[in-house]
């Protein structure tokens, strides 16, 4: 089952990206290094609800 989720920057807390994940394959919270347009740099983005 694929679910929609939002990725938030860990430094400025802005919700920058929407994505989907398969809960069966990834039961833990998703973490990715992505570009944050508000910080103007690559930062760690974590899954939010």
Curated annotation (Swiss-Prot):
SUPFAM superfamilies: Zn-binding ribosomal proteins (SSF57829). One of its GO terms (biological process) is translation. InterPro entries: Ribosomal_bL33 (IPR001705), Ribosomal_bL33_CS (IPR018264), Ribosomal_bL33_sf (IPR038584), Ribosomal_zn-bd (IPR011332). GO terms for cellular component: cytoplasm; ribonucleoprotein complex; ribosome. Pfam families: Ribosomal_L33 (PF00471). Coiled coil: none annotated. GO terms for molecular function: structural constituent of ribosome. Keywords: Ribonucleoprotein, Ribosomal protein. Belongs to the bacterial ribosomal protein bL33 family. NCBIfam families: PRK00504.1 (NF001764), PRK00595.1 (NF001860), rpmG_bact (TIGR01023). This is Large ribosomal subunit protein bL33. It comes from Clostridium acetobutylicum (strain ATCC 824 / DSM 792 / JCM 1419 / IAM 19013 / LMG 5710 / NBRC 13948 / NRRL B-527 / VKM B-1787 / 2291 / W). The gene is rpmG.
């Amino acid at each position: 089952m694929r679910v929609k989720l939002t990725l938030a920057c860990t430094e400025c807390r802005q919700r920058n990206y929407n994505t989907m994940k398969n809960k069966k394959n990834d039961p833990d919270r998703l973490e990715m290094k992505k570009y944050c347009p508000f910080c103007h740099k690559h930062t760690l983005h974590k899954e939010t609800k």
